[in-house]
């Protein structure tokens, strides 16, 4: 029975990944044997399943049990600095897009991080003309998501296909919006300055059970703070989905 | 096989406490210490003072056995608890929910998706819907969003919807107000002791009335819309004691820029900021709003000013709803005190691209500017324009750069054309602005504070340098990604307009 609940790999639940990314990621298998040993006992199996069917859709049922199951993300990282405000994540001119409308949701994904200054960020997070990003993990510094309360910000990141941000700390409203929408896991690092050691395009794994971030390209391993009670809410798909799943509110709308 | 230890580990991790959002807001508040910038402002110091008991009226909420701050008390009452501690998560009854044209349609979408197409809002009199962001634009989606609000308000019979239909002439829309935070105050929706949530980060503006007010996202707002409640984490409180006579060349904007420069843009994350002291007591309601408006720029969850006779006077003709102010107990626990001698402060700016990038205005006198913008919830109120007019009047000169004036609300616009400016022999702001060569005050809205659609009035479409009375100077905030924004008080903005450089207003006010 132990195998009945396979460790869950969440990639993008919203958008199909490009085949390029899948290929690139499977080549990164080669890095795995160099992982530090203490983690092996915990995560060996999930890591295998994580890497092989990398962006195969996550098992859609089994989710109730999956509160305790693995949540792991793997792929290219996109690295930003301190105080990334929500105007840079999604500039205000695009706030006419309504996230609850599916086509506009997708459009928001294509615009994620379009407000970053080009001089400092020559590589776009989403290539022009595409709807989704080839980066699956965002790595940032202090106070990520500060500024405007626009929920469009975590939605744009989630809609782009990225599901996890790893930063030193978060602005309050952004963190809460990540959890409420279930769009993005906002994970905190134990140490500061990781973003300075990582480069956009590095291949990384974020393991929310072992609470660490592995930079395979650089051969480094960093501790993360546990996501805690927010994890199951995000995994369920946000506060409403979580509340239904756990019986806090009735399962169907009137 | 290997999955079983995993599952076990996992369940151990997650079985601790799985209530909804148990830690939604529990991400570490750990971020403050390591960002202290070195400022060249040695003269202006925030000194951490030993806890001092300000003279305050006793608690009005009965038992004082468990000392609480204002914010704790408001949340205790709203959650029907006799006492609570910072860090607790409580279900709070919301008094007013505000949304606007940028986040309203998404909130409505979530409300309908989750509660059903035919669901009714929890209380049609407690939801205030204010189109204000993208109004005077030909952007079809922006216009559609206002239509979505209108349809919803009709369907739900929402009592307070400040509609606009005739975009060609805002004055033809008697219901239209303009910038939500200022409209909330002017229309009597801000009341001491209450809980106000809004889908806008500057909802904290209403803390000026001694109430709890904070910004939330669409999903949370959709939840409130259906239930009237929200799970909130009780924040600990930082106390800011501002004493001393306010120099004639300073405004509340200087005070809040001083504070944000001191504690950084993350210095109050997850925390409440309470402002008191003799200077705060001397501030008008609009100035108190400026102070509270920008607490989110320090990461604050909310800001509060204790209600007093200034508050009650302001509310006299604005609301008939009974309210009950609350005050921090004498022995309430504040996690930190900051004390400022306001009489020693000087006019400030926040340099690009962060609101905590503080500098003295006079230190930036060599910064050449291309334009000045006076407007927004932070700096577009009647008194903000009065202050700018005072500088123009004192100088008797003309502006050297384009100067854009965007009144926050229709009421402010009327004031610009109707109220005489002190010492001007009866001239109005609009006359003074015209004589100084400013652009004619435009239709009230959020305008270019946040850039907005391309055809937004005064949007920064070129990489220019702007002195602005708004609240954020992030990359791209007012339009162009490479634009540079210096945040300043209306005095400093007007003085800068007159010289074409960032300018200390004492050059004209003394």
Regions found by a protein language model. Give the residues of each.
Chain B
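Fe-S-dependent hydro-lyases/dehydratases of central metabolism
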Residues: 2-510
